[in-house]
């Protein structure tokens, strides 16, 4: 098959190069005692995420959105950080459902109002929702 014949979007990976890059990064981080949780927003591949966790020593996976986290959890990954706030009743129900399944999912927040929403949703469902608080250190990102 020629490259122009591949239906897009498609993930095309040079496996040998990926293996070398993963080994180099994992080795460097291991030498320095750094725990790492790589972002899945580029590859969006549970298979690659599993490789990073089970073979390269990552402590989990970071997802941009709740939907990505659900895909990773459905594939057996259960240490997940969602880098963006999860808002809206339907999404909060989905987040709570992951916690009820036993998925170790943490959500980044930067708004106290959202923390209160998480607290109420968690209280109603009888679960906890771990959060990490994003602090604006002047870069306004």
Identify the role of each PLM range.
Residues 11-14, 22, 111, 115:
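Generic structural signal for well-ordered, non-membrane alpha-helical segments
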Residues 39-141:
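Active-site-proximal beta-alpha core segment in soluble small-molecule metabolic enzymes
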Residues 9, 32, 101-102:
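Structured helix-beta-strand junction loops
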Residues 1-13:
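Generic N-terminal amphipathic, Lys/Arg-enriched alpha-helix
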Residues 2, 21-25, 88:
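N-proximal short alpha-helices
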């Amino acid at each position: 098959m020629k490259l122009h014949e591949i239906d897009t979007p498609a993930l095309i990976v040079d496996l040998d190069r990926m293996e070398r890059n993963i080994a180099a990064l994992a080795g460097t981080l291991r030498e320095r005692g750094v725990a790492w949780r790589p972002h899945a927003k580029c590859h969006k591949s549970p298979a690659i995420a599993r490789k990073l966790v089970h073979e390269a020593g990552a402590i989990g996976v970071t997802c941009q959105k709740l939907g990505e986290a659900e895909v990773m959890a459905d594939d057996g990954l259960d240490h997940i950080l969602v880098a963006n706030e999860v808002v809206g009743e339907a999404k909060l129900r989905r987040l709570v459902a992951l916690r009820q399944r036993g998925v170790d999912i943490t959500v980044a927040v930067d708004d106290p109002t959202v923390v209160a929403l998480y607290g109420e949703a968690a209280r109603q469902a009888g679960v906890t929702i771990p959060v990490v608080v994003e602090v604006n250190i002047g870069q306004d990102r």
